[in-house]
């Protein structure tokens, strides 16, 4: 990853776990929208329409998913934004590397420009919602469970209706923008 190389080149501290968590957060959002919109990749559409289309060949599991939005664009932007906050003097260069990563996939014929630009917009919103420093998973269940679950102290806890509603409301707000 270009972000790793950059951080290493300038001896900037980074945590592979943090990067992994950012990628995981981005991946969940990307999967949601890929499944929702099922947009074919440019080379797939060209093939179906019997059009000549020049694209780079890549055999990868990520290429077996729909095009929209671009996971690489979203994840690299999340990483760039996160480390850009930690190292403001390097933010512009990190963003530039993230854009190269994402837009390079457009140039390769694997994505449409809107796959990239939408992913950047999603990442810019998502970075303010992601807190990788402490996850609810990392907190002992007894600490958070009563606020989140009914029957929290049993083997069969149920998420509280108020929590489900809050999550559904957040998803609706997020989807209006994308």
Q: Predicted segments — roles?
A:
Residues 1-111, 117, 121, 125, ...:
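Hydrophobic alpha-helical bundle signature of multipass membrane enzymes
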């Amino acid at each position: 990853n270009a972000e790793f190389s950059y951080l290493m080149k300038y001896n900037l501290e980074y945590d592979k776990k943090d990067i992994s968590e950012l990628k995981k957060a981005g991946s969940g959002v990307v999967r949601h929208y890929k499944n929702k919109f099922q947009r074919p990749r440019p080379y797939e559409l060209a093939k179906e329409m019997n059009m000549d289309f020049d694209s780079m060949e890549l055999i990868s599991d990520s290429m077996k998913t729909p095009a929209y939005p671009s996971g690489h664009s979203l994840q690299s932007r999340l990483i760039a934004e996160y480390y850009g906050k930690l190292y403001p003097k390097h933010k512009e260069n990190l963003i530039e590397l993230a854009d190269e990563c994402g837009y390079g996939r457009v140039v390769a014929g694997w994505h449409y420009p809107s796959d990239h630009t939408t992913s950047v917009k999603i990442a810019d919103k998502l970075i303010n919602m992601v807190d990788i420093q402490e996850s609810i998973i990392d907190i002992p269940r007894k600490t958070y469970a009563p606020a989140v679950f009914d029957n929290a102290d049993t083997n069969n806890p149920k998420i509280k209706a108020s929590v489900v509603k809050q999550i559904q409301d957040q998803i609706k707000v997020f989807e209006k923008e994308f």
